[in-house]
């Protein structure tokens, strides 16, 4: 368990922008015992009280879909070197699972998600704020591949969701948060120069004991 205040890094960007690749690249620069990733996707609101048909209409790209109160509470606990029980979201039933994941605090905490820079309360907790900027055509291709392969979605359903929710929400809520980023990374995890700069900054913060 770490004693000093952890370094909190926010990695934002549109769906399919390469946030996970950036996060993975950063993690490779540090030991597993020193870095922790908290995905905003785990903090979608519990919808177990709603009929399944209503859950199907959830706009997962809207700020109101997230339980930021719980995410903030958990981040504050980790920053005070306290463990948390991280929720698990089940996309097949469109609500929170009964399972939780026990998470211990570490020196570096990466918070990754499409809308982590949208909530000022989250932004205030971050030492470094990153926005991964990727062209829309590449983002939709990546989302298609992910949702069909990993979430059992059909091609038609993914395209319909993109037109109805993903694209409008990106333009209205996600893209504008770029202005709050300290670092904007084009080309995602392939931008090794940006990754090197971030890793150096993290190391400097850790060495100062901030």
Curated annotation (Swiss-Prot):
Report the GO molecular function annotations. Answer: ATP binding; cytidine kinase activity; uridine kinase activity
Residues reported to bind ATP? 13-20
Chief site of localization: cytoplasm
Provide the protein's localization: Cytoplasm
- Biological process GO terms, please? CTP salvage; UMP salvage
From which domain of life does this come? Bacteria
Q: Which GO terms describe its cellular component?
A: cytoplasm
Q: Looking at the keywords, is Transcription present?
A: no
Q: Which Gene3D superfamilies match?
A: P-loop containing nucleotide triphosphate hydrolases
Q: Give the catalytic activity.
A: uridine + ATP = UMP + ADP + H(+); cytidine + ATP = CMP + ADP + H(+)
Keywords, ordered alphabetically: ATP-binding, Cytoplasm, Kinase, Nucleotide-binding, Transferase
The enzyme's E.C. designation = 2.7.1.48
**Part of which pathway?**
Pyrimidine metabolism; CTP biosynthesis via salvage pathway; CTP from cytidine: step 1/3; Pyrimidine metabolism; UMP biosynthesis via salvage pathway; UMP from uridine: step 1/1
PANTHER family of this UniProt entry? URIDINE KINASE (PTHR10285)
Q: Which family does it belong to?
A: Belongs to the uridine kinase family.
Protein name per Swiss-Prot or TrEMBL: Uridine kinase
Q: Which gene encodes it?
A: udk
């Amino acid at each position: 368990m770490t004693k000093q205040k952890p370094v909190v890094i926010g990695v934002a960007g549109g769906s399919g922008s390469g946030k996970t690749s950036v996060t993975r690249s950063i993690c490779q620069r540090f030991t597993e015992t020193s870095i922790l990733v908290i995905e905003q996707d785990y903090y979608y609101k519990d919808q177990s009280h709603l009929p399944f048909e209503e859950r199907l209409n959830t706009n997962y790209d809207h700020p109101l879909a997230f339980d930021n109160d719980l995410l903030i509470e958990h981040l504050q606990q980790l920053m005070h070197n306290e463990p948390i029980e991280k929720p698990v979201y089940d996309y097949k039933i469109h609500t929170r699972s009964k399972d939780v994941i026990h998470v211990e605090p570490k020196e570096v905490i990466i918070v990754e998600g499409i809308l982590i820079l949208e909530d000022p309360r989250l932004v205030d907790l971050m030492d470094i704020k990153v926005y991964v900027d990727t062209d829309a055509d590449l983002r939709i291709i990546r989302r298609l591949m992910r949702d069909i392969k990993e979430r059992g979605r059909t091609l038609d359903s993914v395209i319909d969701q993109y037109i109805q929710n993903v694209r409008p929400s990106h333009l209205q809520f996600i893209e504008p948060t770029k202005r709050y980023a300290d670092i904007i990374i084009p080309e995602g995890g392939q931008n090794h120069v940006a990754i090197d700069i971030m890793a150096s900054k993290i190391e400097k913060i850790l060495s100062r004991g901030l």
